[in-house]
Swiss-Prot record:
Name this protein carries in UniProt: UDP-N-acetylmuramyl-tripeptide synthetase
GO molecular function: acid-amino acid ligase activity; ATP binding; magnesium ion binding
Signal peptide start and end residues: none
InterPro entries: Mur-like_cat_sf, Mur_ligase_C, Mur_ligase_C_dom_sf, Mur_ligase_cen, MurE/MurF_N, UDP-N-AcMur-Glu-dNH2Pim_ligase
Species this protein is from: Tropheryma whipplei (strain Twist)
Residue stretches spanning the membrane: none
Length: 509
C-alpha cells in the first residue's frame, strides 16, 4: 500500500514540472493524485506509478501488475517500449519526462512536503541501523519524537522494505508520514547504493554521520575506492550541514581530512585529533553481559553509562548517537540526565545480536551482520560470554560479493566449536556452490563442520546438540522477513524458528 500524501490535481502537478501529457484527452487533467510509488504491486487508484529504467529492467515492464492508477510517469525509453510492445495502459494518462530524476523529486516534494522536520542520516558499512535506532531511542527518552527509515521490522510484502534506504518516493512518503505524526526529527540510513542512484533526492541532512568502511558491495562498486567515494558524496556539495565521523579506521581519518575540519570526530584512540576542537573521546568496558561506556566531550563533560545490547560495537554506536544528537543542538547534560535516571540504555533491536533463552536452554543469538567485519564482531562478542561451546550457523547471500565467502568460513571455523553452513538469500545462484565457497575457507579438520541447506533444520540441529552453557550464534540473516530464492520472496522468520527450536528443547523432543 502506498503512503498517502497531500492531494493535488494532476493538471497542477504537470504545470509545476517539465513533464508532458501524451496520448490522452484533457479529461484526465482533473484527476487527483495523493501518492507516488515506484513499486508496481503497491499502486493504488490515486497514485502516480513511476516507471523508469532499473538496474536490469524498465519499470514499464511491470505495468501488467498495476491494477489502477491516476497516471504513469515514464521517460522516453519507457514510452518507446510501451508503443513497440503495445503494453496496456487502460486509458491511463501517460506522463513523459526528459529529466526523470529531477522531475520525480519535484513531484515527490509536492505530494510529500517534508519541510519543518529535521533530518539526520548515517552511512558506513556496519552500525548504521543500530546507531540510528539508538539515537531515536535517546530522543524518545527525552520526550522527543523521531521517525525512522529502517530495515528492521518490515514485512515480506513491502517490496522495498529490505533496501537499506527506500526508493526516493517511499523515502519522501515516510518522512512526510512522520511529519504528519508530529515527529520532530527523522533518521535515515544512507547506503552507498542510495547515494549513487539518487534515492535521497535533494534532501539536505542536518547531520551526516560516518561509522566505518570495510569491504562490502564489491559486486556494485568493484573496488574499495569507488565504495569510499560513494559514501564521501554524502558529505560534499552541501548534502549535509554538519558531520560526525568515526576516525578509528583509515577511511574515517581520510574522510575527515578530505571534507574539512568542521566535523565532530569520535575515537577510542587518543592519538587521533586530540588537538581538534570537536574531538570526542570514547571508551568501552564490559559490564556483565552488556557494555558500559565513557564519552568525553570537547569541553571535558563526561558521560558514563551502559547499553543492554550485547557487543562492544553497540556501546561505541551509542557514543556516536550521542554526538549526533549534540550536533543537532541537544544539550549533553540533558542526554546524561535521562541515561542516569534510566540506569543506562535498555533496548532490543530485532535481529541485531538479539538473545533468545528460556529456562536452562542454551543461549541463542540472532544477528543480521553479514560483512566479514560484522561477523567477526559477532563471533568475538558471542565467544566472550560463552562458558561452554560456541555453535555457529552461517550463510552468505547469492549474487553478492563472492570473495567474502571464504573469509566467512575461515572466521567461523576459527571461533566456533561446531559450525553449520546453511542457505540464505541464494537468489539465482546455486546454493550448494555458495556453501562450498564458505566451506573452502574453513581451515584444519572439518569434522565439526556440517552443511544443512535448510536454515530451519540447521537451527534445530544446532539447538538439539547444545547444552545449557553453550551459545548458538545465527549469523548473517537477522530479522529479514523472507528468503529470496529464484526470484521469489518466500516469507520466513529466523527468529520464529529459533523460538520454536527453544520450545522443542524445553519439551525435550
Amino acid at each position: 500500500m502506498t503512503l498517502q500524501g497531500k492531494p493535488y490535481r494532476l493538471s497542477d502537478l504537470i504545470k509545476q514540472t517539465g513533464v508532458r501529457l501524451t496520448d490522452c484527452s484533457n479529461q484526465f487533467s482533473d484527476r487527483f493524485v495523493s501518492g507516488i510509488t515506484q513499486i508496481a504491486q503497491s499502486v493504488e487508484r490515486d497514485d502516480i506509478f513511476v516507471a523508469f529504467q532499473g538496474k536490469t529492467r524498465h519499470g514499464v515492464e511491470f505495468l501488467d501488475q498495476v491494477q489502477s492508477c491516476a497516471a504513469v510517469l515514464t521517460d522516453n525509453k519507457g514510452r518507446h517500449i510501451m508503443q513497440s510492445d503495445c503494453l496496456p495502459t487502460r486509458s491511463t494518462p501517460i506522463l513523459v519526462t526528459d529529466s526523470p530524476r529531477s522531475d520525480l523529486i519535484v513531484l515527490a516534494k509536492r505530494v510529500y512536503p517534508i519541510d519543518d522536520i529535521r533530518i539526520f542520516g548515517i552511512t558506513g558499512t556496519n552500525g548504521k541501523t543500530s546507531t540510528m535506532h539508538i539515537a531515536a531511542k535517546l530522543l524518545e527518552m527525552m520526550g522527543i519524537s523521531c521517525g525512522i527509515s529502517t530495515t528492521i521490522g518490515s514485512s515480506a510484502s513491502e517490496s522495498d522494505s529490505c533496501l537499506t534506504t527506500p526508493e526516493l518516493c517511499q523515502l519522501y512518503a515516510r518522512i512526510f508520514t512522520a511529519k504528519q505524526a508530529r515527529a520532530d526529527f527523522f533518521a535515515l540510513e544512507a547506503s552507498s547504493h542510495a547515494i549513487n542512484r539518487g534515492r535521497l533526492g535533494d534532501i539536505v541532512l542536518e547531520v551526516a554521520a560516518f561509522t566505518n568502511l570495510t569491504p562490502e558491495h564489491m559486486e556494485e562498486h568493484k573496488n574499495m575506492e569507488a565504495y569510499y567515494q560513494a559514501k564521501k558524496a554524502l558529505f560534499l556539495n552541501k548534502r549535509s550541514n554538519s558531520a560526525v565521523i568515526n576516525i578509528d579506521t583509515p577511511y574515517g581519518i581520510r574522510l575527515f581530512k578530505e571534507t574539512g575540519c568542521s566535523a565532530s570526530v569520535i575515537s577510542e584512540n587518543t592519538k587521533y585529533g586530540l588537538d581538534h576542537k570537536l574531538f570526542w573521546q570514547a571508551s568501552v568496558r564490559r559490564v556483565g553481559l552488556s557494555f558500559g561506556f565513557t564519552l568525553i566531550s570537547p569541553s571535558g563533560y563526561r558521560v558514563e553509562s551502559s547499553i543492554s545490547l550485547l557487543g562492544k560495537a553497540f556501546a561505541l554506536n551509542t557514543c556516536m548517537a550521542i554526538v549526533i544528537l549534540c550536533n543537532l543542538g541537544i544539550d549533553i547534560e540533558r542526554i546524561d540526565s535521562v541515561l542516569r535516571k534510566a540506569g543506562g540504555l535498555k533496548m532490543v533491536l530485532p535481529g541485531r545480536m538479539e538473545v533468545f533463552q528460556t529456562g536452562n536452554s542454551p543461549r541463542v543469538i540472532v544477528d543480521h551482520g553479514h560483512t566479514v567485519d560484522a561477523v567477526e564482531t559477532a563471533l568475538v562478542a558471542a565467544k566472550s560470554i560463552t562458558r561452554g561451546r560456541l555453535i555457529t550457523i552461517i550463510n552468505a547471500d547469492g549474487q553478492r560479493d563472492p570473495s567474502k565467502r571464504k573469509h566467512l568460513g575461515q572466521l567461523c571455523g576459527a571461533y566456533s566449536d561446531k559450525l553449520f553452513i546453511t542457505d540464505g538469500h541464494s537468489r539465482f545462484e546455486n546454493p550448494a556452490e555458495i556453501r562450498r565457497m564458505i566451506l573452502d575457507g574453513v581451515e584444519g579438520p572439518r569434522r565439526q563442520v556440517e552443511q544443512i541447506p535448510s536454515m530451519t533444520q540447521a537451527v534445530l540441529a544446532a539447538i538439539d546438540i547444545a547444552r545449557s552453557d553453550d551459545t548458538v550464534l545465527c549469523s548473517g540473516f537477522g530479522d529479514d522477513p523472507y528468503l529470496d530464492v529464484l526470484g521469489k520472496k518466500i516469507p520466513y522468520s529466523l527468529r520464529d524458528e529459533v523460538r520454536r527450536g527453544l520450545e522443542r528443547f524445553a519439551q525435550g523432543t
